[in-house]
């Protein structure tokens, strides 16, 4: 009788070990996915900052061109 109890206990312990091993593997997979997503977020943030800087430069260029165009139109009106 005690041998049967020991076998059942051994089976339960082995099942617990298997479950723990699977959970550890899942944790490692989730950690890797988390690292990957963190890198993607960092890249996206960097890209956003770059685009914001480029946008600001383009706005400044547009402002310069608008001022030049206004000056040119003013000269054309003076000629007429």
Curated annotation (Swiss-Prot):
GO cellular component terms given for this protein: cytoplasm
Keywords of the record: Cell cycle, Cell division, Coiled coil, Cytoplasm, Septation
InterPro entries: Cell_div_ZapB
Source organism superkingdom: Bacteria
Localisation per UniProt entry: Cytoplasm
Any coiled-coil regions, as ranges: 3-80
UniProt-listed GO biological process terms: division septum assembly; FtsZ-dependent cytokinesis
Task of the protein: Non-essential, abundant cell division factor that is required for proper Z-ring formation. It is recruited early to the divisome by direct interaction with FtsZ, stimulating Z-ring assembly and thereby promoting cell division earlier in the cell cycle. Its recruitment to the Z-ring requires functional FtsA or ZipA.
Subunit structure of this chain's protein: Homodimer. The ends of the coiled-coil dimer bind to each other, forming polymers. Interacts with FtsZ.
Family per similarity comment: Belongs to the ZapB family.
NCBIfam families referenced in this protein's UniProt entry, alphabetically: PRK15422.1
The protein's name in its UniProt record: Cell division protein ZapB
Gene name linked to the record: zapB
């Amino acid at each position: 009788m005690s041998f049967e109890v020991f076998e059942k206990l051994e089976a339960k312990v082995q099942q617990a070990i298997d479950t723990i091993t699977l959970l550890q593997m899942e944790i490692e997979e989730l950690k890797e996915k988390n690292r990957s997503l963190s890198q993607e977020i960092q890249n996206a943030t960097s890209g956003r900052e770059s685009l914001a800087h480029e946008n600001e430069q383009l706005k400044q260029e547009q402002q310069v061109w608008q001022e030049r165009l206004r000056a040119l139109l003013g000269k054309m009106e003076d000629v007429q």
